[in-house]
Amino acid sequence: MKLKTMTMEWTGDSLILIDQRRLPFEEVYVTCADYRAVALSIKEMVVRGAPAIGATAAFGYVLGAKEILKKSHNYEQVVMQMKNVKETLAKTRPTAVNLFWALERMEKRLIRHGKYEGLVKVLEDEALKIAKEDIEVNKAIGRNGAQLLQDGFTVLTHCNAGALATVDYGTALGVLRAAKEQGKKIKVYADETRPYLQGARLTAWELMKDGFDVTLISDNMAGWVMKQGKINAVIVGADRIAANGDVANKIGTYMVAVLANRHGIPFYVAAPLSTIDMSIKSGKEIPIEERSHEEVLTCGGKRVAPNNVNVYNPAFDVTDHELVTAIITEKGVVYPPYEENIKKLFEEGI
């Protein structure tokens, strides 16, 4: 079976990823023929966005199994060697919980199968299931979130939580897409999202392709456009949500949440249940990835800072649950108190 979306294509023998580092100026694709290439693509942000990383890792796991099964026909040995594949993929990005969720799911499927025969097909089917479920989940998130947006609303978003950050459709941008599909006129302000410029490079490009009225602003303009009354709601995605509703997302999200709170603007987080980590009580326990100093020292490949200056470059921050108006999931919209209602969500659904 095969899969093809804007973000990725699974051919059965390789995983082809759109190189998000090159957008919007070039549409270049990277072909990953083994799990090491998949791991490198995740680490170097050829692919990014928590749900997309999870699905990518699942296909990387399949490629690892294909490689190992060519050398070994002993099921127990395969299981042991697949632990190395899982570890290689898992250590690429520490913050996005979907990565670990997808790999755990693949490993459980491996163990549940319990034999060498038919193993690759079973794992491939599971990876495809993860990918296709993501699309269905995102559309459900979109439908649930669209009810929060009125016709004529202007929405601010940060980073990119669209089709490029998922297998397809998107979480935060999926809400905007669903609202548009319902006939609502929605305008969008997109933060540029320094230092990696996901808002400028990816969100603006993606929304323009879909015919949205989108305005790009630098990150330090967000407070001013809010004060001017231009923004009706903020919608962002998430890389990990703690059991109490604290949200780890792209650096700068916390700043936007504080500003929205100050101006009385609802701040919504759109994310699948797979992004909620019930093993983590609060955002204080979420590991925050730090990336290369060069991302801050340069812009568009040109150096913008003096030599030898100190640099701090966390890729994510944590927004306190008190600043979150609601969390939009595929099962419905969750409101405070989050610790209680998130638990109910997993136990009963909404």
UniProtKB/Swiss-Prot annotation:
GO biological process, alphabetically ordered: L-methionine salvage from methylthioadenosine
Highest taxon of source: Bacteria
Residues the UniProt record annotates as site (Transition state stabilizer): 159
Listed GO MF terms: S-methyl-5-thioribose-1-phosphate isomerase activity
Metabolic or biological pathway: Amino-acid biosynthesis; L-methionine biosynthesis via salvage pathway; L-methionine from S-methyl-5-thio-alpha-D-ribose 1-phosphate: step 1/6
First-tier enzyme category under EC: isomerase
Protein EC: 5.3.1.23
Catalyzed reaction equations: 5-(methylsulfanyl)-alpha-D-ribose 1-phosphate = 5-(methylsulfanyl)-D-ribulose 1-phosphate
Family note: Belongs to the eIF-2B alpha/beta/delta subunits family. MtnA subfamily.
Name of the protein: Methylthioribose-1-phosphate isomerase
Species name: Fervidobacterium nodosum (strain ATCC 35602 / DSM 5306 / Rt17-B1)
Gene name per UniProt: mtnA
